[in-house]
């Protein structure tokens, strides 16, 4: 269509030129009379000239007299060492002016021995076919055919694509370009552009229209640089130097130009939608690709909708009857032999259905046998119904059903046995893993070393517990309400833990020997407890009375059933008897006075089993017990006024941040971590007045600090990935 417009513009230009030669309008004649045309028609002529310039696309050169036609000749049997320039010189010498020469190249840039030559005039094309046909070039006779519609070149190009997949534009021309699916399936990109891009024959310049008049080439380059490397950007201007609202952008690669069309066509720039397309000079002059021909429809049919196949293509109904091994299921007969043939293929089997079922054991670990049973049952029911209905091929399914009998027997025999063996092998592995857990738990027998630590509790800190217990009274009152809330939650959680804890029961039995070794150590602890009863404990224990009442109700919610499921009864009464608890209950507890009350008794009864099982859980590292930190830990925690023991790790509220940007200040650090919770303190580590790239942040609770580690660790600040950890040295 654009070519037709240009042709019309040329005709209009010719008419204007003829009018100018005949006489300028409005110029008075020799007798002073006005000419045949008045001065009022001059603006109309100027408008025509402007329209002519716009339609011609800025006076671009068009080498063809009639742009709608191409006068091509297709030459084959060209020596492989002949370059396109040499071929052009030969054709120019023998025929005349040549517009375009293209050698077809393979993927390696070597000549395929054929070429396309375009001429400006039709006579030149016919002369080339007469003169150059059978002309000897380097000992090889050339074969020249007229090819105005490009059919011969199209076939040759298809043959090249089928063999090598490459095509060049000339000497050293590029091969076929691999196009990503995002471009191939993009509805905004025409098919002819995609074909030209694949062949490497597409330019890298795009044409942009409907630009705002204040957009200059710098702004245009800035915008289109998002699509690729911009080599040049131009804004077309009028004779006064003002923008015409159109421009061109040249990229480094053709695929970047196609990407620019996809990214910016229809997008707003200063509230005006841009119209982006390939520039006419970037498109190949000859179309050597098969056009996208629409599907031929019957006469009178306007169109069709989407089919049921992939991409809306119609599907062949014949393929629907070819199910995977399900035979031909229809009113005439079920075709059970088809089921057998299909299932045989599932395992690479051969033979009828019965022989194939032997190998069903291969699928023991991966197939849902219940689902297979359901499918077979439904198939048998359908077969019985069809057999009862009779008629047609109904009887043809009976032999297939009979053949299924021994096959199903084999499925229940050898196949299921193999499944059992496979499951048994898996359970054996689980058993071996549990045995390994037992060995680990056996190593906990080193609890005997706890005895020496407990023995140190007496002289180190137990005598000083009186003043500490007084201070504990108020704290325990605050803990009471929390324990009540914990009761309901722990009870619900322990119910879920019942099944896994049952499995650990056998392992806990192995802990019995380790607990038995604790007996003599706890006997020594009984003697130390007798020293704990100075009069100063009375006031503190009186305050603990109501607190223990609350703890009792919380422990009641935990439920005895949940504790029984924990497998603690397997530890044995003998082990607990040897712990020397009778010495702790006789004299020591009586001297602790009525302040403990019956609530403490009930609480201790319910806490006994739980504390017995969990007492050693805090000492995960055997190396701490070897160093005697057990006794020192309790001495520090009971004897000191709220001090933390060196052997027991406490949760810190401070985090340490590494790899911070060097321009980061403490205020910026605080503002950033305020997203995680309330920050009490933030600081940047400095050296000689310069940041060391690390800092600390302190929160109001350990939970907030841990949340900050989870949220901020690995986050990028100014391009640097920070490392956030709990500050253990705080």
From Swiss-Prot:
The modification N-acetylalanine is found at residue 2. Residues 400-608 are annotated as: 27 X 6 AA repeats of [GEVSTPAN]-[ILMV]-[DE]-[RH]-[MLVI]-[GAV]. It comes from the Eukaryota. Sequence repeats lie at residues 400-405, 407-412, 415-420, 426-431, 433-438, 440-445, 446-451, 453-458, 461-466, 468-473, 475-480, 482-487, 493-498, 500-505, 507-512, 514-519, 521-526, 528-533, 540-545, 547-552, 554-559, 562-566, 567-572, 575-579, 580-585, 588-593, 603-608. Transmembrane segments: none annotated. The modification Phosphoserine is found at residues 29, 86, 204, 365, 377, 397, 432, 452, 468, 481, 528, 575, 588, 618, 633, 637, 701. Residues 1-62 are annotated as: Disordered. The modification Omega-N-methylarginine is found at residue 496. Residues 38-50 have a biased composition (Basic and acidic residues). SMART domains: RRM. One of its GO terms (molecular function) is RNA binding. It is found in: Nucleus, Nucleolus. Residues 71-149, 204-281, 653-729 form the RRM domain. There is a cross-link at residues 17, 37, 69, 83, 88, 127, 134, 143, 145, 221, 277, 285, 345, 381, 388, 651, 667, 685, 692, 698, 716 (Glycyl lysine isopeptide (Lys-Gly) (interchain with G-Cter in SUMO2)). There is a cross-link at residue 698 (Glycyl lysine isopeptide (Lys-Gly) (interchain with G-Cter in SUMO1)). The modification N6-acetyllysine is found at residues 134, 277, 672, 698. Residues 1-13 have a biased composition (Low complexity). GO terms for biological process: alternative mRNA splicing, via spliceosome; mRNA splicing, via spliceosome. Sumoylated. InterPro entries: HnRNP_M_PY-NLS, hnRNPM_RRM3, Nucleotide-bd_a/b_plait_sf, RBD_domain_sf, RRM_dom, RRT5_SRSF_SR. The modification Phosphothreonine is found at residue 665. GO terms for cellular component: catalytic step 2 spliceosome; collagen-containing extracellular matrix; extracellular exosome; membrane; nuclear matrix; nucleolus; nucleoplasm; nucleus. Identified in the spliceosome C complex. Interacts with PPIA/CYPA. Pre-mRNA binding protein in vivo, binds avidly to poly(G) and poly(U) RNA homopolymers in vitro. Involved in splicing. Acts as a receptor for carcinoembryonic antigen in Kupffer cells, may initiate a series of signaling events leading to tyrosine phosphorylation of proteins and induction of IL-1 alpha, IL-6, IL-10 and tumor necrosis factor alpha cytokines. This is Heterogeneous nuclear ribonucleoprotein M. It comes from Homo sapiens (Human).
